[in-house]
From Swiss-Prot:
GO terms for biological process: proteolysis. Disulfide bonds join 60-76, 192-207, 216-246. Belongs to the peptidase S1 family. Keywords: Allergen, Disulfide bond, Glycoprotein, Hydrolase, Protease, Secreted, Serine protease, Signal. InterPro entries: Peptidase_S1_PA, Peptidase_S1_PA_chymotrypsin, Peptidase_S1A, Ser/Thr_Proteases_Immune/Dev, Trypsin_dom, TRYPSIN_HIS. The active site is at residues 75, 126, 220. Expressed by the venom duct. The keyword Lipoprotein does not apply. It holds the Pfam family Trypsin. This is Venom serine protease. GO terms for molecular function: serine-type endopeptidase activity. Its EC number is 3.4.21.-. Glycans are attached at residues 84, 104, 155, 158, 218, 266.
Length: 277
């Protein structure tokens, strides 16, 4: 292994990312008034997006990373390649998808382009970038997450992270009508391997677990957020990929965002990211 080349590549990626940062905000949340609840406040998490499909009852989550891109799971889009993603829309600023009365920032966007990771398969490299035809209208209620430029080597084991989505409230149950949140803990790769094996639980997977808590069906593609202890910004560290069933004794598997920063950069060339203060 040529360590020199690996170090040079890492420095190059970080250098490119920093050269494209701007002094604009990212990764903020709006204070919640809900105590010990799992429903979020309206527009509490401005970076959350949702993919909606022609088929009723199917949803995926996503996260705003630039004014025209979201990141999601590849399996949310792979089977729609043959139809050029016709009928799929990106929705931002949403809380309760059955009504538009609780917030004035909900907007639907058509898709211009989808970039699926070239090495995606059913359990590896499950990440994709969606570009919309129009740019998002940023406000305090709609805006980007922070990407982990400053945390490429940070060990998140035992750290608390937050999963967000409109997914099912229990396995094979009904979808939540409102955006919900759940706090989980990051576990070690070795712990994850005992459930899924080394081929799946590789270095590109971020595994999360808490007894009785989990992301669930239709939460796929949604964010796993970690709050920076130094800046208080919300950092995108994972993209929801899979679980055995919802909230059983097996961890959830999420694409580890730090492993895919070069892919994200290459899929968003020409865009600028906001940096954490």
């Amino acid at each position: 292994m040529n360590c020199g080349k690996i170090i040079l590549l890492f420095i190059t990626i970080i250098g490119v990312a920093k050269s494209r940062e701007e002094n604009c905000k990212c990764g903020w949340d709006n204070p919640s008034r809900i105590v010990n609840g799992v429903e979020t406040e309206i527009n509490e998490f401005p970076m959350v997006a949702r993919l909606i499909y022609p088929s009723p009852g199917m949803y995926c989550g996503g996260t705003i990373i630039t004014p025209q891109h979201i990141v999601t799971a590849a399996h949310c889009l792979q089977k729609y390649k043959r139809t050029n993603y016709t009928g799929i829309h990106v929705v931002v600023g949403e809380h309760d998808y059955t009504t538009d009365t609780e917030t004035n920032v909900t907007k639907r966007y058509t898709i211009a382009e989808v970039t699926i990771h070239p090495n995606y398969n059913s359990h590896n490299n499950d990440i994709a970038i969606v570009k919309t035809n129009e740019r998002f209208e940023y406000s305090m209620k709609v805006g980007p997450v922070c990407l982990p430029f400053n945390y490429m080597t940070r060990n998140l084991t035992n750290e608390t992270v937050t999963a967000l989505g409109w997914g099912k409230l229990r396995y094979n149950g009904q979808n939540s009508k409102v955006l919900r949140k759940v706090d989980l803990h990051v576990i070690t790769r070795e712990q994850c391997e005992t459930h899924y094996g080394a081929a799946i639980a590789n270095a590109n997977l971020l595994c999360t677990f808490d007894v009785g808590r989990d992301a669930c069906q239709n939460d796929s593609g949604g964010p796993i957020l970690w709050r920076s202890p130094t800046t208080d910004n919300l950092i995108l560290v994972g993209v929801v990929n899979f679980g055995r069933t919802c909230a059983d004794d097996a961890p959830g598997g999420n694409a580890r965002v730090t492993s895919f920063m070069e892919f994200i950069h290459n899929a968003t060339i020409g865009e600028t990211y906001c940096k954490a203060d």
